[in-house]
């Protein structure tokens, strides 16, 4: 596992979100493999509520597993960067498959999850850009699309963040595109 290489690779990985799933899958696997990280799409098991998991296969190899739960591009990319945070910042302490229901009262667990969520959010949408957009936008589709283009992400990623922060999932659902991944 090459931590410094992975840190440097994050902007390249982020750019892949603009491609179609069939176009970015092989490139994503290749970029991550250069850093000692494998990625696999695994089936979603009903009622587990798991979008992703991270585990260390050896001292030099990490496996990130993503499920097709919710099947939307914003959740897929958010989950990828969430798991990459566990790899970069939390190390080999434990595998990071988290059943929220089992751990929501565990302060240490929640701190790691909150940190990974923040990392994913801020990697996809830079905080200063987000703050300016959110403060000054009337949240029209055209504004969302233009903002997404400006920061180099798909509109669905911005719509997903807006949905999560406002609780208005239906309002932005048209921009949140579904993805199909082969498991």
Residue ranges and their predicted role:
Residues 1-183:
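Active-site hotspot residues in diverse enzymes, especially metal/ion-binding acidic/histidine motifs
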